[in-house]
């Protein structure tokens, strides 16, 4: 799995109830044809990334088929989750 691009938006907390900053990432994912996640239309990953003081984490995510926006029922493997977390840390500024 390779991340080839992204869109990011900082989410606003209108009531100030949540600590830290939240970002919504739409990651463009390149997947090998042999991978069960592969789709001819392409695959994306929506991520809610939270940065709170020294703690960065992925709050939620899901894979989707680009074009149809159909949600795909897959989970990130541990190494992939680290890759996504690192990517979000590096690209969080809008």
Give the role of each language-model region.
Residues 30-43:
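Short, cysteine-centered beta-strand-loop-beta hairpins and adjacent loop/turn segments enriched
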Residues 21-29:
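A short hydrophobic beta-strand element
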Residues 7, 18, 22, 44-46, ...:
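Compositionally biased, intrinsically disordered low-complexity regions
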Residues 12-22, 35-38:
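Short, solvent-exposed beta-strand/turn "edge" segments of beta-rich domains on protein surfaces
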Residues 1-17:
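Short amphipathic beta-strand and strand-loop transition segments with alternating hydrophobic
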Residues 44-94:
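Acidic, low-complexity intrinsically disordered segments
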Residues 7, 12, 29-33, 49-53, ...:
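Beta-strand elements of well-folded, non-transmembrane domains
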